[in-house]
Amino acid sequence: VSAYVVHALMVVVALFMTAIALSGVVGGPLSSWIMQAFAGVNGWAGWQWLFLLEGIPSVLVGIAVYFYLDDSIAKAPWLTEAEKRLLIDNISRDEGTRGDHSLKQVFRNGRVWLMASIYFCFIMGLYGISFWLPQLVKTAGVKDVLDVGLLTMIPYGLAAVAMVLASRSSDRSGERRWHTAGAGFIGGIGLILSGIFGGDLALAMAALSLATMGILTSLPLFWTLPTSMLRGSAAAAGIALINAVGNLAGFVSPFMVGSVKDATGSTTAGLYVLAGSLFLGGILVLLATRGRQHSAQLAAA
């Protein structure tokens, strides 16, 4: 995404991150089929085959990326010299409008830590829905493993559409603040409704779809905020810091929901905690961007 200027970044990031939603569309039924079809083959459990067969493509793609993905625009062999100059000039012009920060300033910048906190809150919701969506569908009355996988396609499919539509709306209007916070709020509302209507399949699926749409849409919208603040080596350090802090939620979220489920026999209380995290993330977005109508103005801070 470093080849795109800020005003065009939103749709690009959203299209890139729709891979998360599309992997849910494909991965749900595929995982269910693997677990059913391969259970007992070679003496392995279905989940063991699942890990093997779905892990191999990731390894192969990683190898391909190492050889194919270039470090910079200047090294891209599939661009002409004129295209390289145009892109480099556009990026240089765009970066000139952002504040310059040293690495030391990044780690001492309260706004960067605030962004990391926002990302942590949103990732709490992402991992919660990723790990527990099949279980929530099962709780709503679906017992067959393959049926559960097929039904999980619905929230992820709708989320992929929502991500693109919301990003286009944000780019057209230039408004980032309420788009980002609103996505977090919608995700939180969806999780609360999922807890309330967990026993009704139709209502539960509608609520889970709303939650998934809000959670996944919040992620590409969020990334326009820190990327508009920082540039150069400071951008790499700042984004790495935000990622590191935010992805701690990858451990906290599933563990927390699982612990609540073990203690209460239900995931409902865990859903409410995740909803609270999303609401907090949305509120922090509004606080972090007070007085700024879109992310381009954030650089003036």
Give the residues covered by each predicted segment.
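Paired intracellular helix-loop junctions of major facilitator superfamily
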Residues: V1-M10, L225-A236, G265
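Small-residue (Gly/Pro/Ala) motifs that create kinks and tight helix-helix packing interfaces
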Residues: S23-Q36, V61, V65, P134, ...
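A late C-terminal transmembrane helix in Major Facilitator Superfamily
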Residues: G24, M229-S266, L274
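Helix-to-loop junctions at the C-terminal end of transmembrane segments
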Residues: A162-E175, K261
